[in-house]
């Protein structure tokens, strides 16, 4: 626990006193010894400009009894080294988020960081609270029932869904989401019919969310109410620096695009694995989530979601669910990539065409604001 005093460069530690509303914030730019702490007493009329008068023994006792140490590694959230940390949280200095009017509690420190590279030196900061707020607008004539948990949104079909044979069915979820800056959503689906596959989708800020259903059988499918379930999990996103990426184009709204470097063909009802000359060298805690692109899904190609780790070359597993050979030209987007510190796994599905992605971040918490809408 005491090793939190010596951290890497440009990481921040927030020390919170449980018995009062006073917080101590500081950046650690070098290894700090406990004996080198300032000895200036902190009085009641001062706020966050000085450190408490402690020595090594009293400081350890203070950590064990009255203090909770919380470490937020800046590289995980894409905060630049000149990131801003608020030193006061008085009401006259409140800032509003884009999604809701966030009412801060007095004395609660809030960390601001930009999400996109274009905003890193911008004047407007983005407020990230302990429980990010997500606005959910559900259309009244929706075909989906919406259930909100502490960390995700679940949608279950309440009407019949017709999936034609040898076609890709695009299903509108009839919900709109306003996701706070710095986060994204990942949609994973499951169907009770083994011949119906749900394509994984990522969303950043969508007002017209739709998913793809693929029929792998030789006849049309009729999905009964309750046969299809979609889960929307929300995770923090990260934009690596340009020197951390190899053979990847700049992102669009925090999403990178993996394009085919050479042409290839996908034979009918068969698998093919394509390798790409790309790599990244970010922090160990980061991983890249590779989601099939919409252009590929519309062709009837089923791509298995890939969890791309650092210092490795990505490989994409493609299944041609159609009865014809599909030609993939050079330059077409195969997959979309987003970087996050979330935790995932691929569940082995022997009876399915591809394995299923599962999000393991069950301890995260979000504040959902639900609103019913009359718009179709």
Curated annotation (Swiss-Prot):
Gene3D superfamilies: 2.70.40.10. Coiled coil: none annotated. It catalyses: dUTP + H2O = dUMP + diphosphate + H(+). Signal peptide: none annotated. Pfam families: dUTPase (PF00692). Its cofactor is Mg(2+). Keywords: Hydrolase, Magnesium, Metal-binding, Nucleotide metabolism. GO terms for biological process: dUTP metabolic process. It comes from the Viruses. Its EC number is 3.6.1.23. One of its GO terms (molecular function) is dUTP diphosphatase activity. The keyword Endoplasmic reticulum does not apply. HAMAP family: HSV_DUT. Belongs to the dUTPase family. Involved in nucleotide metabolism: produces dUMP, the immediate precursor of thymidine nucleotides and decreases the intracellular concentration of dUTP to avoid uracil incorporation into viral DNA. This is Deoxyuridine 5'-triphosphate nucleotidohydrolase. It comes from Human herpesvirus 6A (strain Uganda-1102) (HHV-6 variant A). The lineage of its organism: Viruses, Duplodnaviria, Heunggongvirae, Peploviricota, Herviviricetes. The gene is DUT.
């Amino acid at each position: 626990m005491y090793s939190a005093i010596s951290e890497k460069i440009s990481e921040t530690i927030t020390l919170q006193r449980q018995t009062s509303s006073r917080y101590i914030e500081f950046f650690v730019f070098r290894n700090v010894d406990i004996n080198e702490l300032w000895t200036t007493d902190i009085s009641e009329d001062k706020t966050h400009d000085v450190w408490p008068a402690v020595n090594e023994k009293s400081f350890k006792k203070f950590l064990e009894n009255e203090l909770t140490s919380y470490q937020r590694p800046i590289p995980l959230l894409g905060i630049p080294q000149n990131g801003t940390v608020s030193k006061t949280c008085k009401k006259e200095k409140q800032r509003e988020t884009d999604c809701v009017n966030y009412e801060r509690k007095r004395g609660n420190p809030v960390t601001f960081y930009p999400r996109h590279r274009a905003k890193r030196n911008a004047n407007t900061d983005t407020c990230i609270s302990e429980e990010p707020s997500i606005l959910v607008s559900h259309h009244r004539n929706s075909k989906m029932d919406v259930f909100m948990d502490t960390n995700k949104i679940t949608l279950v079909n309440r009407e019949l869904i017709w999936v034609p044979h040898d076609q890709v069915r695009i299903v509108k979820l009839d919900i709109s989401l306003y996701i706070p800056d710095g986060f994204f959503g990942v949609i994973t689906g499951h169907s009770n019919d083994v011949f119906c596959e749900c394509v994984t989708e990522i969303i950043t800020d969508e007002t017209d969310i739709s998913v793809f259903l693929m029929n792998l059988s030789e006849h049309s499918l009729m999905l009964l109410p309750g046969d299809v379930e979609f889960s929307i999990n929300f995770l923090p996103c990260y934009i690596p620096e340009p020197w951390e990426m190899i053979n990847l184009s700049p992102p669009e709204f925090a999403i990178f695009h993996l394009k085919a470097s050479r042409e290839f063909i996908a034979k009918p009802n068969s698998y093919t694995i394509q390798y790409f000359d790309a790599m990244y060298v970010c922090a160990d805690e980061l991983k890249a989530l590779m989601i099939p692109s919409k252009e590929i899904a519309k062709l009837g190609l089923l791509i298995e979601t890939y969890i791309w780790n650092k210092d490795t070359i990505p490989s994409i597993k493609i299944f041609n669910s159609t009865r014809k050979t599909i030609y993939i030209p050079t330059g077409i987007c195969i997959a979309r990539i987003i970087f996050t510190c979330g935790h995932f796994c691929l569940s082995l599905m022997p009876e399915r065409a591809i394995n299923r992605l599962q999000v393991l971040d069950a301890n995260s918490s979000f504040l959902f604001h639900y609103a019913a809408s009359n718009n179709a």
